[in-house]
Design a protein with these regions (language model features):
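A conserved beta-strand-loop-helix scaffold within acyl/acetyltransferase catalytic domains
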Residues: 1-3, 7-8
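A short, internal acetyl-CoA/4′-phosphopantetheine-binding micro-motif in the GNAT/acyltransferase core
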Residues: 8-16
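Conserved acetyl-CoA-binding loop-helix of GNAT-fold acetyltransferases
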Residues: 16-29, 104-106
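Conserved GNAT acetyl-CoA-binding A-motif
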Residues: 31-43
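Conserved active-site alpha-helix within GNAT-family acetyltransferase domains
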Residues: 44-61
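C-terminal "cap" of GNAT-fold acetyltransferases
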Residues: 64-84
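Histidine-anchored nucleotide/phosphate-binding helix
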Residues: 101-115
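Conserved small/polar residues in nucleotide/adenosyl-binding loops
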Residues: 205-206
């Protein structure tokens, strides 16, 4: 029972009869029985009004997709929980599956160029990250970078979108999926996370 609602569709013959509302309500009810209170969804921009009427709020939107959450304060609470840096600040978003000398070198090099370096480790436990859990990857990076005094380590939470989280069922041209995913992720990071922390330099890596 995950936290992302997806594969929601209503046949053309049934549209306009409240089918989407019934489906979403049932999915939310099921998620709640599994202990999931924070829920997210990806959809086409033209569906925003529909999902807003069902209690979801925009996190980020591009011309190809929109990312929504069933809370007005979820993103703010996440941003408030992040340790703040000082001066010129940079950021790295990494998978680290597992943490390698390549990751270490990248972080050391980036940290030498800024006053504070924010490193976000992807929090998801997916098939792609089956070898090392999110917590194991976080701890490996924590131990491997403790000598970098100006490095601030964060869990990505639900607000940095990886390609394994991003669904593509609503995208007609699957070749566009990677671009739309990246655009949405960068929009959310650039419009909310970076300004909240004062980040001006970003590196995004999925080195394994």
């Amino acid at each position: 029972c995950g936290s992302v609602l997806k594969y929601i569709a209503v046949s053309e013959a049934m549209q306009g009869e409240g089918g989407a509302a019934s489906i979403v309500s049932e999915l939310v009810r099921h998620a709640y029985t599994c202990g999931r209170r924070k829920l997210f969804l990806f959809t086409k921009p033209q569906n925003e009004y529909l999902f807003r009427s069902l209690g979801f709020f925009r996190l980020a939107a591009t011309d190809g997709a929109i990312y929504m959450e069933n809370s007005r304060s979820g993103l703010k609470n996440y941003l408030d929980s992040l340790e703040k840096g000082r001066g010129v600040q940079g950021a790295i978003v990494a998978n680290c599956n597992p943490f390698t000398l390549g990751h270490k070198y990248l972080m050391e090099t980036a940290a030498a160029q800024v006053d504070s370096l924010h490193v976000f480790i992807l929090s998801e436990n997916s098939a792609e990250n089956a070898e090392f859990s999110a917590e194991a990857r976080f701890e490996l990076v924590k131990k491997g970078t403790k000598h970098i005094k100006n490095l601030l380590l964060h869990r990505s939470g639900d607000y940095i979108i990886s390609h394994s989280t991003f669904p593509t069922y609503f995208i007609k041209d699957k070749a566009d999926a990677g671009r739309i995913n990246a655009d949405l992720d960068l929009t959310l990071f650039g419009s909310a996370i970076a300004p909240a922390l004062g980040i001006t330099t970003v590196s995004y890596t999925h080195l394994r």
